[in-house]
């Protein structure tokens, strides 16, 4: 079964998908759509001679092509809702890049419509497929009952995007949605119960302060601490800094149970496993997934994501990363942004106005 792909949005992430799909058998990219001429040229250059592309400025023309089986939506965050509304008029499969949407009402709309859609709807939260994360999950039974999870990301500022759309909360959903939905998804993946309350403190203290776009000053935060309480008493914490480049590690993850602790770093090739009873620790080498043919920006996770999506489509299975998981990840980000704005902790059931349980 050969699958024909169309890519909507061919900036940095769209071209990342193209590089991955080039290495996967029985896949053909037949069309791309992007209103920006330079981005369309990037897609052509990335494809090289692997695919003969049809180029569109308007994504609606791409969605109208009957020979396209799977659509990858990698357009700017704020466009996701309008593109998905059009996609839901078709039966095509879709990989929708993170974040699923930039606000709660749009997220609920996509979630509800996805339940009736004939095609697979997959959300691009590929961090869960990184080898260090998979290694943590493989050893989680060795640390007993999980009590705490800490994720630290200290990295470089946001890169420049077309028309600088990623400088403003209204177009990104906010830093804790745009960037950190990945980490909230990992928390939801690893923690044994549901989140019930969130508190965040953060601000824009260093980055983009001297930038102006059409007279507007960027308002995206560049650092934050986020604390999450879970219904069975577990706790999770996110430590984010966007002006901390040049460190040895970009991400550090610590998962603590009542019998031990797991630690890993990204980039890195080891997991440290601590045993309280034996008062000992040992290092476990991370085994890279042998299926990976393209490492890309995310340590091979995007490649595995595509393999899993293709397998899901061919076998008629439910997606591993469905709209509910995508929705849950943005709920935490949006609630954290609200907590920073109000200075108060946010009860998640109240935040959702009793419409959904996460």
Specify the residue positions occupied by each region the protein language model found:
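Beta-strand-loop-alpha-helix segment that lines the small-molecule cofactor/substrate pocket
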Residues: 63, 69-128
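Short, Asp-centered acidic motifs that coordinate Mg2+ and/or phosphate
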Residues: 31, 70, 148
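Predominantly a Rossmann-like dinucleotide-binding segment in NAD(P)-dependent oxidoreductases
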Residues: 127-217, 343
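Active-site loop of classical SDR/Rossmann-like NAD(P)-dependent oxidoreductases
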Residues: 16, 38-39, 294-306
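Contiguous beta-strand/loop segments that form the cofactor/metal-binding neighborhood of enzyme cores
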Residues: 185-270, 303-315, 354-358
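Conserved SAM-binding strand-loop segment of SAM-dependent methyltransferases
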Residues: 52-58
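N-terminal Rossmann-like dinucleotide-binding module
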Residues: 1-50
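C-terminal helix-rich "cap/oligomerization" subdomain common to oxidoreductases
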Residues: 7, 26-27, 47, 70-72, ...
């Amino acid at each position: 079964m050969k699958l024909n792909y169309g890519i909507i949005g061919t900036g940095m992430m769209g071209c990342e998908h193209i590089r991955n799909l080039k290495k996967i058998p029985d896949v053909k990219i037949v069309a791309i759509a992007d209103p920006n001429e330079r981005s369309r040229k990037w897609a052509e250059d990335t494809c090289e001679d692997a695919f003969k592309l049809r180029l569109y400025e308007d994504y609606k023309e791409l969605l109208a092509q009957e020979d396209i089986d799977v659509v990858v939506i990698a357009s700017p965050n704020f466009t996701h809702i309008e593109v998905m509304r059009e996609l839901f008029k078709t039966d095509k499969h879709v990989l929708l890049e993170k974040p699923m949407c930039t606000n709660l009402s749009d997220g609920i709309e996509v979630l509800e419509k996805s339940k009736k859609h004939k095609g697979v709807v997959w959300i691009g939260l590929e961090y869960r497929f990184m080898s260090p994360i998979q290694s943590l999950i493989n050893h989680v039974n060795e640390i007993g009952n999980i009590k705490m999870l800490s994720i630290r990301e200290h990295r470089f500022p946001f890169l420049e995007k077309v028309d600088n759309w990623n400088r403003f909360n209204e177009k990104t959903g906010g830093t804790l949605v745009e960037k950190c939905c990945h980490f909230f998804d990992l928390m939801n993946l690893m923690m044994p119960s549901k989140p019930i309350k969130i508190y965040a403190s953060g601000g824009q203290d260093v980055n983009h302060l001297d930038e102006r776009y059409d007279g507007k000053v960027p308002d995206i935060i560049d650092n934050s601490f986020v604390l999450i309480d879970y219904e069975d008493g577990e706790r999770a914490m996110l430590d984010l800094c966007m002006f901390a480049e040049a460190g040895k590690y970009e991400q550090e993850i610590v998962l603590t149970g009542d019998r031990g602790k797991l630690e890993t770093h990204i980039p890195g090739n080891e997991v440290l496993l601590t045993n309280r009873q034996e008062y000992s620790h040992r290092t476990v080498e991370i085994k890279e997934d042998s299926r990976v043919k393209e490492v890309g920006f995310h340590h091979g996770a995007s490649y595995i994501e595509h393999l899993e999506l293709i397998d899901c489509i061919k076998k008629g299975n439910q997606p591993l990363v469905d709209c509910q998981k995508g929705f849950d990840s943005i709920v935490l980000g949006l609630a954290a942004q609200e907590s920073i704005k109000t200075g108060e902790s946010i009860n998640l059931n109240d935040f959702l106005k009793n419409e959904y349980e996460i």
